Amino acid sequence: MSHRKFSAPRHGSLGFLPRKRSSRHRGKVKSFPKDDPSKPVHLTAFLGYKAGMTHIVREVDRPGSKVNKKEVVVAVTIVETPPMVVVGIVGYVETPRGLRTFKTVFAEHISDECKRRFYKNWHKSKKKAFTKYCKKWQDEDGKKQLEKDFSSMKKYCQVIRVIAHTQMRLLPLRQKKAHLMEIQVNGGTVAEKLDWARERLEQQVPVNQVFGQDEMIDVIGVTKGKGYKGVTSRWHTKKLPRKTHRGLRKVACIGARHPARVAFSVARAGQKGYHHRTEINKKIYKIGQGYLIKDGKLIKNNASTDYDLSDKSINPLGGFVHYGEVTNDFVMLKGCVVGTKKRVLTLRKSLLVQTKRRALEKIDLKFIDTTSKFGHGRFQTMEEKKAFMGPLKKDRIAKEEGA
C-alpha cells in the first residue's frame, strides 16, 4: 500500500505569527531611515492608493548580460499619490527607554476631511475639533506660547516629524475621512528641520519632492483579506491520501498525547489575509504628473514616452477596474504590491544602502500599455478604437435625424 513518507519539513513560516486580522488598515512605519545631517532636509515617507496594474516595455541597460540592449516586458503597479497636506509638527527626545514625545503643534487651519479622522461618527458629532486650539494662533498669549514651544523643540529635540494627511476629495473613492500619519523629517540640523516644517504648515507636499526616478523604496500595507480558511489553503500542508477517513484537507497528527495541549507551531485553520506586511526594494519606474490645465486645455498625456508619442493618459480604456481614473500624480512601481484596489499604501524610503547593479540601473521606458483591463483589450486609445471600428449605428442615426 502507498503511504506518505514519515519525515517532512514543516509547512509555512512561523515568522509571521499570529496570523490574524491586522489591527490597522493603514500600513504603519515601524522604523524610518537613519538620519544624515549632511543631506538636505527631506521627508522619508508618503501615502498612496493602489489603482491597478499594467505592463511596460523597456530597454535593459546591463552590460555583460544576455538581455543587454534588448526589450523586455515588465508588469508594473500604478499607485495614485495626490499631494499630502502638512497639518502638524511633533518633536521627540531620545531617552534610555527610546523616543518620547516632547511637543506637538498643530496648524491654525485644518480641513474637515482631516478632522473626520478624530470622530467615529462625523454626521452626529458637534464638529468642534480644534476650535479652541486654533485660537492659539490668533491671540498674543497663544502666539508667545507657540514660539516658546518651537524654541524649546529646537533646544531639546533630536527627532522632528510632521503630521500630514491625504486629500480624499481628489480621489475617485467614496471615503471622505483622510488618512493621517507622522512622517519623519531627515537631513540638516534640528533647527533646519523645524524651520522647513514650519514653512510647510498647511501647505501641499507633492510626491516628487519625496521620491525620485529609479529610486528603490519599501511598500507597507495590509494584504488582501481571504476570510476564514482551512489548513491546506492557509498553511499549504500536503493533502492526505484519497481514502482518508473524515476528510483530506487536514493535518492528521496535531501532536502527542502529552503535553496535553496543541503547540502553537501546529498548522490550524483560521484567518488568511488582511495581514500587515512590509515589502522592501520596489523600484520606481516612473513618477507621473496628474492632469493639468495649460493655456485653457486639459493636458492628459502622462503615458507618452520618447518612443511612443501618442497622446494618451496612464488610464486604460474604461479606467482601472474597480478603481476608476487616475487624475493626480502617480508612482509606477515594478511588480506587484500588497492589498486590493483602493487600498491605502505607505511608501517609505529604503532603509538599506543600495549597491546592486539592478537597483542603480537607469530605467528607459519605451511603451506603457493602456488597453482595457476588462477583457481582451486591443486598443491603446479611443481614437484608435474609433478608427478601427468605424462609425457606430447610433451615431449614424443621430446624424441623419440632425440633418
Swiss-Prot record:
Positions of post-translational Tele-methylhistidine modification: 245
Bias-annotated ranges (Basic residues): 18-31
Free-text description of this protein's post-translational modifications in UniProt: Constitutively monomethylated at His-245 by METTL18. Methylation at His-245 regulates translation elongation by slowing ribosome traversal on tyrosine codons: slower elongation provides enough time for proper folding of synthesized proteins and prevents cellular aggregation of tyrosine-rich proteins It is not required for incorporation of RPL3 into ribosomes.
InterPro entries, per database record: L3_arc_euk (IPR045077), Ribosomal_L3_dom_3_arc_sf (IPR044892), Ribosomal_uL3 (IPR000597), Ribosomal_uL3_CS (IPR019926), Transl_B-barrel_sf (IPR009000)
Annotated protein name in UniProt: Large ribosomal subunit protein uL3
A GO term from the CC aspect: cytosolic large ribosomal subunit
Subcellular location: Nucleus, Nucleolus; Cytoplasm
Region: Disordered, residue numbers: 1-37
Function: Component of the large ribosomal subunit. The ribosome is a large ribonucleoprotein complex responsible for the synthesis of proteins in the cell.
Record text on subunit structure and interactions: Component of the large ribosomal subunit. Interacts with DHX33.
Keywords recorded for this protein, A-Z: Acetylation, Cytoplasm, Isopeptide bond, Methylation, Nucleus, Phosphoprotein, Ribonucleoprotein, Ribosomal protein, Ubl conjugation
Modification type Phosphoserine: residues: 13, 304
Main location as per UniProt: nucleus
Modified residues (N6-acetyllysine): 136, 286, 294, 366, 373
GO biological process terms on file: translation
Covalent cross-link Glycyl lysine isopeptide (Lys-Gly) (interchain with G-Cter in SUMO1) as placed by the record, residue numbers: 294
Assigned protein family: Belongs to the universal ribosomal protein uL3 family.
Cross-link (Glycyl lysine isopeptide (Lys-Gly) (interchain with G-Cter in SUMO2)): 39, 224, 226, 286, 366, 386, 393, 399
Keyword check for Phosphoprotein: yes
